[in-house]
Amino acid sequence: MAAFTLDLMAQLPEAYQAYAPAVDVLPLIPIFFFLLVFVWQASVGFR
C-alpha cells in the first residue's frame, strides 16, 4: 500500500502539467482586481 501511495504521489505533478500555464497566471488575478478598483473609481469620479 505504501509503495502504491508513493508511486501515486510521484505521478501527480506530471498529471497536472497541462494546467501549468493557468497556474502561472493565477497570481496575477488579484492584481487585476486591484487595478479594476482604480478604473471603477475613475469612471465614477472618485466619490
Curated annotation (Swiss-Prot):
UniProt topology in membrane: Single-pass membrane protein
Subcellular location: Cellular thylakoid membrane
Transmembrane spans: 20-40
UniProt superkingdom: Bacteria
Listed InterPro entries: PSII_PsbK (IPR003687), PSII_PsbK_sf (IPR037270)
Prodomain residues: 1-10
Cellular component annotations (GO), alphabetically ordered: photosystem II reaction center; plasma membrane-derived thylakoid membrane
UniProt key word Transmembrane: yes
Primary location class: membrane
Signal sequence coordinates: none
Gene Ontology BP, a term: photosynthesis
Alphabetically ordered keywords of this record: Membrane, Photosynthesis, Photosystem II, Reaction center, Thylakoid, Transmembrane, Transmembrane helix
Subunit description: PSII is composed of 1 copy each of membrane proteins PsbA, PsbB, PsbC, PsbD, PsbE, PsbF, PsbH, PsbI, PsbJ, PsbK, PsbL, PsbM, PsbT, PsbX, PsbY, Psb30/Ycf12, peripheral proteins PsbO, CyanoQ (PsbQ), PsbU, PsbV and a large number of cofactors. It forms dimeric complexes.
Family matches, as PANTHER family: PHOTOSYSTEM II REACTION CENTER PROTEIN K, PTHR35325
Protein family (similarity comment): Belongs to the PsbK family.
NCBIfam families, per database record: PRK02553.1
Role, per record: One of the components of the core complex of photosystem II (PSII). PSII is a light-driven water:plastoquinone oxidoreductase that uses light energy to abstract electrons from H(2)O, generating O(2) and a proton gradient subsequently used for ATP formation. It consists of a core antenna complex that captures photons, and an electron transfer chain that converts photonic excitation into a charge separation.
Protein's UniProt name: Photosystem II reaction center protein K
Lineage of the species this protein comes from: Bacteria, Bacillati, Cyanobacteriota, Cyanophyceae, Synechococcales
